[in-house]
């Protein structure tokens, strides 16, 4: 570093830096980063002053080197770089002549035009952090502060930058060059990390020993010590800082910070239009399972064998017919596709040896359902760029849809308990952390609360379907493979159970890129009559395929069995995330853990046991028009899990946008509730950003409706 400094800086600057370090008793052979920092600071001070003069009329003027008119008065007096005695003599002389207030600390420059002292800062960290440290140290409104960073950022008192843009650009370019030169020699990282904050001489409560070490380790990024952080917090005025930042961005930006009051926010505007429809990749609350208990058949565990065994448990099959047609589809083709599945399964049963996989015959109705040969032919751009009217497809704006009650019912159902267990205790993974006892205890309590939850069934169903579909897409790219939709669970008595929900037929799947689409037809059993909520089933063709005998209070009753058929599609990246759905368990466990931690810190002991075993205690579970809903800890666990699962099942750009933008409004409202007097600018723009995500997605519309309930009672 020392060699670099001597090569990079003017010998006069190097000499001054050496003197300064000597004066403060510092060894430049050891403190090489400090040596470089002093040289940089000196150079910036000199560049700040260079070429700036005041003419006889007292006006500021810029004169380049070698100009014959250079007999003008220098605009800036340089104080930095002089020995301390001389520097204070200059400062005293300026104060006597101009009547300026004497500063407590030695400044770097004096500006004869603006009649003020200037403190120059050069930082390797965030400019605003360094600015606030300087301001906190100086504690004088009379000294003007101007901070530069090596990334081209700057900050000055009241955003008054003193110099013209070109002069400041020259300084920024030089700093950037120094950074590049250091980086090319591998010196930058060490230099960047070595910066210490301004030291303020103030009596404070002293923290020492272990607590001091912990405090230093717990600081946010960019803070090198507890003192820096204290200085930053003490001097921070958020609204003024934001206004300053905005005015730095552009001359046109003129943001006024408006106070955010209880009367300020309005509810989100939900779209009008036909009710939204189901868009999940598989049926949720409406799914029906054909099950076998204690499976021990030949080939148990091979999906096709399991599926055939499950199909044999049902005897009420009948000639299928369409009860709810798909508005835009060729419904007879869906009917023929189901018939083909039944016929080909029958063929397998007639064979001596059941195969492990089944590829369907490529019939015309299956080709239609799977979109075979429907995609427009791709042509290389170079072959058609000369065509005059070449244009992209006109795509229609998505039709606005209104919130329908079925999505709230779906969510409520996902929070409920089933009579089966869907995960084993070790599904979340073994602990490796040192606090294993508490971690295991929390995990076991949580698992017992959610193992029977319907949302957990959706996780295991999603993992199975996505894994099977991705495997088939890679292993049988050209085939229309039949994939059973299967899940496994344990009954209350602990018996194993294999369930069949229906079938998927996969289309051609030459998936080169993550976003390339594989089409599939899903055929799922259900007892739900689609004519009760036809809007929910807009994308489906529904067949009646049999009658099922069900036990009820009045004896056995016969109910029609339906098959929900639709064409759908997914991609490698979506299947990859579908396979990772178990993460939802982890996410909701972490949310519960943070609740336990908050409770434990108040009571100053681990509250895990009390948290889960105190059945009389209720916890906030969500918002409704009535206010905050509360429930048992088990219900809280299941609700958090269901939210996480629905975020995965209904993942979409609309959800991403809504979550990111509505969070900003949520934080503002929370700040208001905490009496932090939040200020906002362009609140209308934030509402616009949130509402442009409210189009037709059922889960997003439900979340927006919940958000409105929250706004209503949060601001009472």
Swiss-Prot record:
Q: Name one Pfam family in it.
A: Flu_PA
**Record PTM:** Phosphorylated on serines and threonines by host kinases, including human casein kinase II.
Q: Signal sequence: where?
A: none
The annotation note on the cofactor reads: Binds 2 manganese ions per subunit.
Task: Specify the domain of life of the species encoding this protein.
Answer: Viruses
Annotated motif Nuclear localization signal 1 (NLS1): location in the chain?
124-139
Give the record's GO biological process terms: cap snatching; DNA-templated transcription; symbiont-mediated suppression of host gene expression; symbiont-mediated suppression of host mRNA transcription via inhibition of RNA polymerase II activity; viral RNA genome replication; viral translational frameshifting
Under Enzyme Commission nomenclature, its number is: 3.1.-.-
Q: Where is this motif: Nuclear localization signal 2 (NLS2)?
A: 184-247
Gene Ontology terms: cellular component: host cell cytoplasm; host cell nucleus
Q: Which GO terms describe its molecular function?
A: endonuclease activity; metal ion binding; RNA binding
What InterPro entries does this protein map onto? INFV_PA (IPR037534), PA/PA-X (IPR001009), PA/PA-X_sf (IPR038372)
Q: Which annotated residues bind Mn(2+) 2?
A: 80, 108
Assigned keywords, A-Z: Cap snatching, Endonuclease, Eukaryotic host gene expression shutoff by virus, Eukaryotic host transcription shutoff by virus, Host cytoplasm, Host gene expression shutoff by virus, Host nucleus, Host-virus interaction, Hydrolase, Inhibition of host RNA polymerase II by virus, Manganese, Metal-binding, Nuclease, Phosphoprotein
Q: Any idea which positions bind Mn(2+) 1?
A: 41, 108, 119-120
Query: Which HAMAP family does the UniProt record give?
Result: INFV_PA (MF_04063)
Q: How does it assemble?
A: Influenza RNA polymerase is composed of three subunits: PB1, PB2 and PA. Interacts (via C-terminus) with PB1 (via N-terminus).
Q: Which family does it belong to?
A: Belongs to the influenza viruses PA family.
Q: What does this protein do?
A: Plays an essential role in viral RNA transcription and replication by forming the heterotrimeric polymerase complex together with PB1 and PB2 subunits. The complex transcribes viral mRNAs by using a unique mechanism called cap-snatching. It consists in the hijacking and cleavage of host capped pre-mRNAs. These short capped RNAs are then used as primers for viral mRNAs. The PB2 subunit is responsible for the binding of the 5' cap of cellular pre-mRNAs which are subsequently cleaved after 10-13 nucleotides by the PA subunit that carries the endonuclease activity.
The protein's name: Polymerase acidic protein
Task: Write the gene name.
Answer: PA
């Amino acid at each position: 570093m020392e060699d670099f400094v001597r090569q990079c800086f003017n010998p006069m600057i190097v000499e001054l830096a050496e003197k300064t370090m000597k004066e403060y008793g510092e060894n430049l052979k050891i403190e090489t980063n400090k040596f470089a920092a002093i040289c940089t600071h000196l150079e910036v001070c000199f560049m700040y002053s260079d070429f700036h003069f005041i003419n006889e009329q007292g006006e500021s003027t810029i004169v380049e080197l070698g100009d014959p008119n250079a007999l003008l008065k220098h605009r800036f007096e340089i104080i930095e770089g002089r020995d301390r005695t001389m520097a204070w003599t200059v400062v005293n002389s300026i104060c006597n002549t101009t009547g300026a207030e004497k500063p407590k600390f030695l400044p770097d420059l004096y500006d004869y035009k603006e009649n003020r002292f200037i403190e120059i800062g050069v930082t390797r960290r965030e400019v605003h952090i360094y600015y606030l440290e300087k301001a906190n140290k100086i504690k004088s409104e009379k000294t003007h502060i101007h901070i530069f960073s090596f990334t081209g950022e700057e900050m000055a008192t009241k955003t008054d930058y003193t110099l013209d843009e070109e002069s400041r650009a020259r300084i920024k370019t030089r700093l950037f060059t120094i950074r590049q030169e250091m980086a090319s020699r591998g010196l930058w990282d060490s230099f960047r990390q070595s910066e210490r904050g301004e030291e303020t001489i103030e009596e404070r409560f002293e923290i020492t020993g272990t607590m001091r070490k912990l405090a230093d380790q717990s600081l946010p990024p960019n803070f090198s010590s507890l003192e820096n952080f204290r200085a930053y917090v003490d001097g921070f005025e958020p609204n003024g800082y934001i206004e300053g930042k905005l005015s730095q961005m552009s001359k046109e930006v003129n943001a006024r910070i408006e106070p955010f009051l209880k009367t300020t926010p309005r509810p989100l505007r939900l779209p009008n239009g036909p009710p939204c429809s189901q868009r999940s990749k598989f049926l949720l609350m409406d799914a029906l399972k054909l099950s076998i208990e204690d499976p021990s058949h030949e080939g148990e565990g091979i999906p096709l064998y399991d599926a055939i065994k499950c199909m044999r448990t049902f005897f009420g099959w009948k000639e299928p017919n369409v009860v709810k047609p798909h508005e835009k589809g060729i419904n007879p083709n869906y009917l023929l596709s189901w018939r083909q599945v039944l016929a080909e399964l029958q063929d397998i049963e007639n064979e001596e040896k059941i195969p492990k996989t089944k590829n369907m015959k490529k019939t015309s109705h299956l080709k239609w359902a799977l979109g075979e040969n429907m995609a427009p032919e791709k042509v290389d751009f170079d072959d058609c760029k000369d065509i005059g009217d070449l244009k992209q497809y006109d795509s229609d704006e998505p039709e606005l849809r209104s919130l329908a009650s079925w999505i709230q019912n779906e969510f409520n159902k996902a929070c409920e308990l089933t009579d089966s267990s869907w995960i084993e205790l070790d599904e979340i993974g073994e602990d490796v952390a040192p606090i294993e006892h508490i971690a295991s205890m929390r995990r076991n309590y949580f698992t017992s609360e959610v193992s029977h939850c319907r949302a957990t069934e959706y996780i295991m169903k999603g993992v199975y379907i996505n894994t099977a579909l991705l495997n088939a897409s890679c292993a049988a790219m050209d085939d229309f493979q039949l994939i059973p939709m299967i899940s496994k669970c344990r009954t209350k008595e602990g018996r194993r159970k294999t369930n069949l929900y229906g079938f998927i037929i996969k289309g051609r799947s030459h998936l080169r890129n993550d976003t390339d689409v594989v089409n599939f037809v899903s055929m799922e059993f259900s007892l739900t009559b689609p004519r009760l909520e036809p809007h929910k089933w807009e994308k489906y063709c529904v067949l009646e395929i049999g009658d099922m005998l069900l036990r009820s209070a009045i004896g056995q009753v016969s109910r029609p069995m339906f098959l929900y058929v639709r064409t759908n599609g997914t991609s490698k990246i979506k299947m990859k995330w579908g396979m990772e759905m178990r993460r939802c368990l982890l996410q909701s466990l972490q949310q519960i853990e943070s609740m336990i931690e908050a409770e434990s810190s108040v009571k100053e002991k681990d509250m895990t046991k009390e948290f889960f075993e105190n059945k009389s205690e209720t916890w906030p579970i969500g918002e409704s028009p009535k206010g905050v809903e509360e429930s048992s800890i088990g219900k809280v666990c299941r609700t958090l899990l269901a939210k996480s699962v629905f975020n995965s099942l209904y993942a979409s750009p609309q959800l991403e946008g809504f979550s990111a933008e509505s969070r900003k409004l949520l934080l503002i409202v929370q700040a208001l509730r905490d009496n932090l007097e939040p200020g906002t600018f362009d609140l209308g723009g934030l509402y616009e950003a949130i509402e442009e995500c409210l189009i037709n997605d059922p889960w997003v519309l439900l979340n927006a409706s919940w958000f409105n309930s929250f706004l209503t009672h949060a601001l009472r």
